[in-house]
Swiss-Prot record:
GO terms for molecular function: rRNA binding; structural constituent of ribosome. PANTHER family: CHLOROPLAST 50S RIBOSOMAL PROTEIN L22-RELATED, LARGE RIBOSOMAL SUBUNIT PROTEIN UL22M. It comes from Deinococcus deserti (strain DSM 17065 / CIP 109153 / LMG 22923 / VCD115). Coiled coil: none annotated. GO terms for biological process: translation. The keyword Manganese does not apply. HAMAP family: Ribosomal_uL22_B. Residues 1-21 are annotated as: Disordered. Pfam families: Ribosomal_L22 (PF00237). Keywords: Ribonucleoprotein, Ribosomal protein, RNA-binding, rRNA-binding. This is Large ribosomal subunit protein uL22. InterPro entries: Ribosomal_uL22, Ribosomal_uL22_bac/chlpt-type, Ribosomal_uL22_bac/org-type, Ribosomal_uL22_CS, Ribosomal_uL22_sf. This protein binds specifically to 23S rRNA; its binding is stimulated by other ribosomal proteins, e.g. L4, L17, and L20. It is important during the early stages of 50S assembly. It makes multiple contacts with different domains of the 23S rRNA in the assembled 50S subunit and ribosome.
Length: 139
């Protein structure tokens, strides 16, 4: 016998019931940096503990480390406040950078022509979760 499926009156009720919330998630949108350059920083901290990642970002000589550190701090505080996780067990479960809209600007060139300068933007997403300690378990 299967469990009866709940019936919802409207789309909003269904979203509230079925909503799968990602714990400790933070997104920074429309950051005025190239996604290619921000990915260099995000690749360094992916999979590390939050305290290690904060220390790495503090001393990393890249301008993209500042907005990534802000997003990481926001994700950490979301996990601590909203989901009541323990700070010393937090680890970066997912971190990725998507390309945002590109601003196109014209640069005048010789003989009345022009080149297009693409000012790229990024969307930075960091998801933080608790570490699963599988060490010391039964064999």
């Amino acid at each position: 016998m299967t469990a009866p499926t709940p019936e919802f009156r409207n789309k909003k009720q269904r979203k509230q019931q079925v909503k799968l919330r990602t714990p400790g998630k933070a997104i920074a949108k429309y950051v005025r940096m190239s996604p290619r350059k921000v990915r260099l920083v995000v690749d360094v901290i992916r999979g590390k503990s939050v305290s290690d990642a904060e220390a790495i970002l503090r001393f990393l000589p890249k301008s993209a480390s500042e907005p990534v550190a802000k997003v990481l701090n926001s994700a950490k505080h979301n996990a601590l406040h909203n989901d009541e996780m323990l700070e010393d067990r937090l680890v970066i479960t997912a971190a990725y950078v998507d390309a945002g809209p590109t601003l196109k600007r014209l640069i005048p060139r010789a003989r009345g022509s022009a080149n297009i300068l693409k000012k790229r933007t990024s969307h930075i997403t960091i998801i933080v979760g608790e570490r699963n300690d599988t060490r010391g378990g039964k064999r």
